[in-house]
From Swiss-Prot:
Classification via NCBIfam families: LuxQ_Vibrio
Keyword Lipid metabolism in annotation: no
Descriptive protein name: Autoinducer 2 sensor kinase/phosphatase LuxQ
One GO MF term attached to the UniProt entry: phosphorelay sensor kinase activity
Organism: Vibrio cholerae serotype O1 (strain ATCC 39315 / El Tor Inaba N16961)
Subcellular localization(s) per the UniProt record: Cell inner membrane
Gene from which the chain derives: luxQ
Domain (Response regulatory) ranges: 731-846
Transmembrane parts of this sequence: 14-34, 283-303
Modified residues (4-aspartylphosphate): 780
Residues annotated with Phosphohistidine modification: 489
Amino acid sequence: MNIRPSQIKHKQRIASFITHAVVVVMGVLIVSVLFQSYQISSRLMAQEGQRTSVQTSSLIQSLFDFRLAALRIHQDSTAKNASLINALVSRDSSRLDEFFSSVDELELSNAPDLRFISSHDNILWDDGNASFYGIAQQELNKLIRRVAISGNWHLVQTPSEGKSVHILMRRSSLIEAGTGQVVGYLYVGIVLNDNFALLENIRSGSNSENLVLAVDTTPLVSTLKGNEPYSLDYVVHSAKDAMRDSFIVGQTFLEVESVPTYLCVYSIQTNQNVLTLRDNFYFWMAFALISMIGVSIASRWWLQKRIQREIETLMNYTHKLMDLDTKSEFIGSKIYEFDYFGRTLEQSFRRLANKEKQFEDLFNFALSPTMLWNTSGRLIRMNPSAQIQFLREDAQNHFLFEILERQLLPTITNAAQGNNPSDVTTEVDGRVYRWNLSPIMVEGQIISIITQGQDITTIAEAEKQSQAARREAEESARVRAEFLAKMSHELRTPLNGVLGVSQLLKRTPLNDEQREHVAVLCSSGEHLLAVLNDILDFSRLEQGKFRIQKNEFRLKELVCAIDRIYRPLCNEKGLELVVNSNITTAAIVRSDQIRINQILFNLLNNAIKFTHQGSIRVELQLIEGDPLAQLVIQVVDTGIGIREQDLTVIFEPFMQAESTTTREYGGSGLGLTIVHSLVEMLSGQLHVSSEYGIGTRFEIQLPIELVEKPDAPQQLLPAPDPQPLFDKTLRVLLVEDNHTNAFIAQAFCRKYGLDVSWVTDGLQAIEELKIHDYDLVLMDNQLPYLDGVETTRTIKKVLHLPVVVYACTADGLEETRQAFFHAGAEYVLVKPLKEQTLHKALEHFKHHHGQKNAGLN
């Protein structure tokens, strides 16, 4: 068996790999240990150096403070001596000289560098050392003023023969014991420049090799003798480095009376211990490296000798396997890993041979037609099932395989190029096959493609029948929608007359019996209109044409509408209406106001309908949240209630809890269905609980966008007074083919003082507008000759007449509404026409088109 050439050119034996691994592991461990030791040692050395430096600095400061304290005590005791006071009072300079000479002889170590006595502003006596340091008399007078602040030590700087002299000075008062008067001031000073004795005294007590006293980097005095391996300039400019240098340079800024100064003491200490530790570390690192090399050489020799024979045994067995001698057995190895590897290899090749036989059997005995193709689209082999089905001719003497090949070849070629293959459906000799394509890849390259077919003739026929049924269902839904639209128009047209005439009759003088008849007429018409609206809303929901339109509105309007509309209805039935709300007048929200009203009104209508005594309670709570607030609506009644088993069906269309409920209370059974759908469209939640004979509770939670509240709450505008809106008579053209609807519309318009002209079709309307000027056109939709939408488009976009068009449609569909707007209409009214609806439309006309009519209020 030919072995594929390896891509790796340079190869090594396993002994070399193991040796390298051992060397690498040992090297990493040794280097890690050495590195860790180095880090720990460096950290310890740095900490030790820092500790030593801190101790040295503290010791230097303590010695410096001790020296100043000794001078302070000596000065204060001298200032209290009676002999000194008497000599000063008598102004006897010789006695003063003798006194201080005797004092210095007794305590020479505490003698200051210079000493003088002054009054408040003049020098009375000095020891003459000032001239020794080159300090002039007038400079001493300046020092008196600079040190006259307190009895503390002062660091002062004074000129002396072209250079600066830094002096520590202190003043003590000389007080006569008999009178208590201050007769003078004793000044003592320590000159820091070239004060070797002071610095040597500090060095001897600080365990330092040398000290340098400097102002910043300018040396004042040092203990260096000149034979050191470092210079004075290097000391004041060097940095601490315990691993590089043989000495450590510390830096201490002196404090005088706990006040930081610019005086700096550089201390030099030996660093020999650290250097010795570093040298030992380097030695052991070199020793570890040499040891690692020796261990590596010995390991390689031992591994080469120990495992060479075992490796040769394993290699010989692999050569046999490559020659397809799958029956040979591995004799075993003394090394566990090699033995396990050889036996695993033996087992793997046996499994591979078994799988090849199983695959061959599966290919040959599969009932599904299976074929193997190369990347050029040429057939390599096919199984017996494919041979039986395609290696024959049809009734027209066409070779079936050639027909199949033409249909499969484009997809096979596409799959051979690396594209994801998709299932292919072919039809051969009246049979439909679905083919699954699977590329066979070796080392990332596609070498062949296997196709497996499935006879889906029966499934294809079922799919065709399913598609036909779907088309029939869609057509049925479309026909039903058209029927509902036509029914809406046909029902709304007579309903417009019923409601319009009943509203007109309400405003005429009537006796009680007639008023009751008119009320029954209005109630019946409103009930029929509500049923019609429910059916149309359900149709739009079912077709997915119901849309949520969000706008900003004052939420308090919802509470006011409940009280205004439903309190009279509850009073008529003797029910108590309780409305509780935390909604303020200032709360402005953004949502679909119409749909929220529709949800609440449907629930209240049901509550009033099914409640005969007791109360109806409405709870409205606005709960602020982030990012959306929650509007919680609860409607609780004491009505007939719902049985538990019926709670699952009340939201189904055209369903009520019981069949007797429909007969007794009426209704379409769509109210709760519409409520449930609207709540879902508003992303809300609906919960219902009920106890039969006790009452029902509905709770709705709606997410709602809370607009930022204004600074001050605004009062709701009162309902408009139904009075004439215009100072002059507006000319209105009514386009309506139905005489009843035209009569109702004209009657309503005349109540507002409008001059109405009536035409019955779109062509007449166009001709009328060409001849006369009108302020407003009320346009019906379904007109003879030319419908309302086309008539509006001709008026607005063809003739460009400057007249306002308000559409009046009876179907109430969103498609009709949008069609009118696209044609150019400014407003759409839905029949049956009501006085309140017309009033709202005229208000819209007044506010949006008033600039064209000077006669508007």
